Amino acid sequence: MSEMPTPVNFTEAAASKVSGLIQDEGNPELKLRVYITGGGCSGFQYGFTFDESQAEDDTVVEKDGVKLMIDPMSFQYLMGAKIDYLEDLQGARFVIENPNASTTCGCGSSFGV
């Protein structure tokens, strides 16, 4: 388990939204897992899920008491990324600004390296 500072920026807005969702679920053991899968129009897709269990090799980023976990395979693609939550005219959503992505699709949910 790695809990050292990491080059992933988990914003206060994202942590606050996750905290509210965890409260809605009524399970304080939940943590947000961010992961990468193959697929999407650009080759890779971002995924978000709640998880109670933390693997030994997960990288953990904590912000305001909320834990974000990233598995080692996904972490290599997310180094330097900013994980944020936005509410604007396009709606409310989690957004990943990833400097490793050489291409992204129009909706921002998939990318290529």
UniProtKB/Swiss-Prot annotation:
Please give the start and end residues of each transmembrane region.
none
CC cofactor: iron-sulfur cluster
Q: Output one GO BP term.
A: iron-sulfur cluster assembly
Key word Zinc present in the record?
no
Give me the comment on cofactor binding: Binds 1 iron-sulfur cluster per subunit.
Q: Which InterPro entries match?
A: FeS_biogenesis, FeS_cluster_insertion, FeS_cluster_insertion_CS, FeS_cluster_insertion_RrpA, HesB-like_dom_sf
Which keywords has UniProt assigned to this entry?
Iron, Iron-sulfur, Metal-binding
The answer to whether UniProt assigns keyword Iron-sulfur to this entry is: yes
So what does this one do?
A: Required for insertion of 4Fe-4S clusters for at least IspG.
> What protein does this entry describe?
Iron-sulfur cluster insertion protein ErpA
Q: Which organism is it from?
A: Hydrogenovibrio crunogenus (strain DSM 25203 / XCL-2)
As recorded in Swiss-Prot or TrEMBL, the protein's gene is named erpA
